[in-house]
């Protein structure tokens, strides 16, 4: 069903996505593998086979997706020229609409993959074409966050539709969608912001790497890898980092007081604590999801980020999954009060063998993982098992 594009990478390393060999970087002359944003052709085919065979947990996950508002044949996009997203709960314009429409396009693309029904491909194209004809910019204090959430989802949806046989996306509409991502999303998500909360930076990087693959943009891809490698060690603490956490490269976090404030008043550091644990666990979940998305997309392109980050990600997952499973926090952590839940963000890590019994227990208990209505969607379906 998929037109798979890409050259084989040479060199030593573990087997990667398909026949690619995993390395630290993508050679400048290497082609990108398509589809290859979060999900590969092989994963999409496995998903289809598991659903049509009635296997669990994929069947229930599929039915939940199909029956969601995003899966409706009658879904209607609501595009805006200027998506304005202010901070502090102020009224915006087009923010929820773009997030939901991007998720709907991705949902319809997955439905087409499973069913082969052209109505789903047509709906995904209709949504993406509506936005590419209208959107010019993101504005407001949360412009980069909005562009990150939606850019990552748009790239996933577009990648599947573009490289699915029979999806019928005209070349001129593909080019227009490329232009939208290049002009309305990429400038926002490519901008370095080392002093922000880490989930925002990782979400932006998630979008940047997905857009880079869709655009066959080596420079943006390489910059996303570098940004990821800077941010992850400064977000997910391990005992080996020393008494204090590492700080983001280029940040102004240069004193103990600033570090304490940046870590939301946490002053005791043990493996698994993250920069936002004492903010709330939901934002930790966003960072976990983005980290897994980036590593998964990189893997499909032959780049191994998992080996660099799995110890940090596993420690964070086990700590926060344990907190959620038990409902209690130790006194040393956030004064004994940790708020929120991780959300539907565990499946990719579990699929890659990252995390221990606490993480797997929570993943199995909360299946099927649905969507957070921001940028995470249907990962039991795509990566479960």
Which residues make up each language-model segment?
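Hydrophobic/aromatic side-chain positions at a characteristic register within alpha-helices
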Residues: 113-116, 212-216
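Amphipathic alpha-helical interface segments
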Residues: 207-211
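Short acidic alpha-helical/loop segments enriched in Asp/Glu that coordinate divalent cations
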Residues: 219-226, 238-247, 302-309
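Histidine-centered active-site/metal-ligand motif
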Residues: 197-200, 280-283
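Active-site-proximal binding-pocket segments
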Residues: 219, 223, 281-292, 296-300
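Flexible internal linker/loop segments at domain or repeat junctions
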Residues: 236-277
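Secretory targeting and sorting signals
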Residues: 1-17
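Extracellular glycan-targeting catalytic surfaces
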Residues: 6, 17-196, 202, 206, ...
């Amino acid at each position: 069903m998929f037109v798979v594009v890409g050259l084989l990478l040479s060199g030593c390393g573990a087997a990667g996505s398909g026949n690619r060999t995993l390395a630290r970087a993508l050679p400048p002359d290497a082609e990108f593998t398509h589809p290859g944003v979060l999900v590969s052709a092989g994963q999409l085919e496995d998903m289809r086979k598991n659903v049509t065979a009635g296997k669990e947990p994929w069947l229930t996950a599929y039915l939940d997706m199909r029956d969601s508002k995003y899966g409706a044949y009658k879904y209607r996009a609501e595009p805006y020229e200027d998506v304005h997203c202010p901070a502090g709960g102020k009224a915006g314009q087009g923010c929820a609409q773009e997030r939901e429409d991007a998720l709907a396009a991705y949902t319809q693309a997955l439905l087409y993959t499973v069913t082969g029904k052209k109505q789903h491909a047509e709906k995904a194209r209709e949504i993406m074409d509506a936005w590419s004809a209208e959107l010019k910019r993101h504005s407001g204090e949360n412009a980069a966050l909005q562009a990150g959430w939606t850019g990552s989802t748009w790239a996933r949806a577009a990648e599947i539709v573009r490289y699915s046989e029979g999806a019928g996306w005209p070349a001129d509409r593909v080019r227009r969608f490329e232009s939208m991502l290049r002009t309305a999303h990429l400038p926002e998500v490519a901008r370095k912001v080392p002093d922000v909360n880490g989930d925002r930076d990782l979400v932006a990087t998630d979008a940047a790497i997905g857009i880079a693959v869709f655009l066959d943009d080596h420079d943006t891809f390489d910059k996303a890898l570098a940004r990821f490698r800077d941010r992850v060690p400064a977000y997910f603490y391990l005992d080996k980092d020393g008494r204090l956490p590492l700080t983001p490269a280029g940040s102004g976090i240069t004193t103990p007081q600033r570090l304490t404030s940046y870590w939301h008043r946490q002053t005791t550091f043990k493996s698994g604590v993250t920069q936002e644990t004492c903010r709330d666990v939901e934002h930790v979940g966003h960072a976990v999801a983005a980290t897994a998305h980036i590593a998964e997309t990189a893997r499909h392109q032959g780049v191994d980020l998992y080996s660099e980050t799995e110890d940090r990600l596993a420690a964070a997952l086990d700590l926060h999954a344990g907190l959620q499973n038990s409902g209690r926090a130790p006194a040393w952590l956030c004064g004994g009060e940790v708020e929120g839940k991780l959300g539907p963000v565990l499946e990719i890590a579990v699929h890659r063998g990252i995390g221990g019994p606490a993480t797997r227990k929570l993943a199995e208990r909360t299946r099927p993982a649905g969507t957070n209505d921001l940028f995470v969607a249907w990962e039991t379906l795509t990566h479960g098992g």
